[in-house]
């Protein structure tokens, strides 16, 4: 895997806004903020700051990578709009990484850390990783990732298969909305240890009490996009900057405010 490049990484799919710069396969600068409703004001600023920290400009970078979702409608639009603006202005290519792929990369980092620094919430191996994004109430956007490509299981698409070439895990179910109850993901929990990770994991821990279930409540971070972004860039999976749209999973539904103006 070629690592001789620079990639700007933008992650705004949840309440955490983060931007990172990767140089030659290493995160060289990073910014994040969980300030409420600050994505629009901070994302472009963070991009400027990580470039300035390294003494380079956008012209010195090879591409821009953005989280494509699923996630917050507003957050995704801010990230994608910023990334597209950078690409339009510089002529740099755009690559996109699924939010769940980022969470799986974070999970692998947590597992690797647990091998040397034992923790109560993370073991040293999982049959499945189940990343999930909070979709409000008891709903999450989730998919199941397996540590190998089992001969009896078909990888869901070419992108998932490409990601599996470098990652230890591959996606084996479609990304879908799930209403969580005590029986959710039972077929996977019965097969062995499962790690639930993401900003939807916490509420699952309240209802899924299976002994094979472990939970990490966290937000996806731009720094964890390094590996999937590098894979997308190496394989030239570039997006059409003019027409690229986030993967919302569900259509946005506008509601009428109940607050009275007068």
Regions found by a protein language model. Name each.
Residues 34-42, 73, 77, 81, ...:
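Residues at secondary-structure transition points
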Residues 2-68:
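N-terminal beta-alpha supersecondary unit
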Residues 50-54, 89, 107, 222-233:
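Stable alpha-helical structural segments in soluble proteins, enriched in small hydrophobic residues
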Residues 214-262:
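Acyltransferase
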Residues 26, 93-220, 253-254:
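Surface "functional belts" at beta-alpha junctions
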Residues 66-99:
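DPxDG-like acidic metal-binding loop motif
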Residues 20, 141-145, 247:
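Conserved hydrophobic/aromatic positions in well-ordered beta-strands
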């Amino acid at each position: 895997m070629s690592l001789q490049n620079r990639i700007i990484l933008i992650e705004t799919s949840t309440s955490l806004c983060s931007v990172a710069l990767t140089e030659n396969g290493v995160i060289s600068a990073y910014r994040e903020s969980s300030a409420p409703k600050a994505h629009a004001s901070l994302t472009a600023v963070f991009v400027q700051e990580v470039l300035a920290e390294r003494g380079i400009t956008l012209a010195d970078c090879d591409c821009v990578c953005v989280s494509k979702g699923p996630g917050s409608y507003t957050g995704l639009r801010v990230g994608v709009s910023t990334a597209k603006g950078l690409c339009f202005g510089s002529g740099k290519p755009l690559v996109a990484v699924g939010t769940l792929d980022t969470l799986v990369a974070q999970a692998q980092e947590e597992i690797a850390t647990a091998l040397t620094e034992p923790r109560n919430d993370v073991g040293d191996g999982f049959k499945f990783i189940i990343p999930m994004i909070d979709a409000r109430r008891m709903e999450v956007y989730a998919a199941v990732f397996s540590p190998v490509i089992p001969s009896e299981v078909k990888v869901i698409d070419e992108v998932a298969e490409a990601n599996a070439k470098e990652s230890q895990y591959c996606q084996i179910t479609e990304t879908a909305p799930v209403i969580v109850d005590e029986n959710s993901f039972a077929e996977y929990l019965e097969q062995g240890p499962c790690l639930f990770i993401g900003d939807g994991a916490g509420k699952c821990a309240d209802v899924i009490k299976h002994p094979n279930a472990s939970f990490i409540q966290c937000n996806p971070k731009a720094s964890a996009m390094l590996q999937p972004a590098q894979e997308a860039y190496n394989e030239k999976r570039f997006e059409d900057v003019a027409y690229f749209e986030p993967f919302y999973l569900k259509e946005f539904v506008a509601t009428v405010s109940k607050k009275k103006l007068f």
